[in-house]
Design a protein with these regions (language model features):
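Helix-start (N-cap) detector for alpha-helical repeat units in TPR-like alpha-solenoids
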Residues: 29-30, 63
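Alpha-helical linker/edge segments of TPR/alpha-solenoid repeat scaffolds
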Residues: 72-98
Length: 214
């Protein structure tokens, strides 16, 4: 219904119906996306920013949402650098059961923690996580180890956007949003549908406060 009103340029009713759809189902990414379009058409740029970011969180890899977000951010004078979290390491188990860790120097701390979670007998279970299951604590430990390694080696964080944003996220206490937005959602976009409205809005704050430059 909101789309019909939007096509007719009856923007007040379009907004009303999109908001109804969102109240009924907060994880409806299309409602947030189309509401952002309506807000853009009515020069409510700040509201458009909020809605398109939520749509981006709910459908992390959609290229059309990415394009819409970039267009809205341009109007709002917000800079969003589009990069991917890309850890440089490989793990393997040798014939003699020894573990092989190959990693870029900067990623060694991250890789070693991943190796412990993957291969250390009983470690995963000792952390309350069943075998073959995922829990965010694994990436928390990996990220903290990565950060400590970068800090100890006096790495210049600003030279790599992954590290620059990581430092900012940890400084501002946004570690979990960093993990969800940068690591989990790009690999498993459907995980967004299990996020609460509160967490989604915290993610939005992360994107606008940590990920973006104004």
């Amino acid at each position: 219904i909101g789309q019909i009103y939007g096509i007719r340029k009856d923007y007040p009713n379009a907004i009303l119906w999109y908001k109804k759809a969102i109240r009924k189902n907060y994880i409806d990414y299309m409602a947030h996306w189309f509401l952002a379009d309506i807000y853009t058409s009515t020069n409510r740029v700040n509201d458009a920013v909020d809605e398109i970011v939520i749509a981006k969180i709910l459908n992390r890899n959609n290229p059309r949402i990415q394009n819409a977000m970039e267009a809205i951010f341009t109007k709002a004078k917000i800079h969003y650098e589009d990069w991917c979290f890309n850890p440089q390491y490989e793990l393997g188990k040798n014939a003699d059961s020894s573990i092989n860790v190959t990693a870029d120097e900067k990623w060694l701390g991250f890789a070693l923690v991943k190796a412990v979670w993957e291969y250390e007998p009983g470690y995963r279970e000792s952390m309350g996580v069943a075998k073959n299951n995922y829990a965010i604590i694994e990436d928390r430990e990996s990220i903290i180890s990565l950060y400590m390694g970068l800090t100890n080696s006096k790495t210049k964080f600003n030279k790599d956007p992954q590290f620059k944003v990581l430092k900012k996220a940890l400084d501002e206490k946004f570690m979990d949003p960093y993990i969800i937005y940068e690591i989990i959602l790009p690999k498993t976009p459907s995980a967004a549908y299990q996020l609460s409205e509160e967490v989604i809005n915290l993610m939005k704050e992360y994107v606008l406060k940590i990920r973006c430059d104004k």
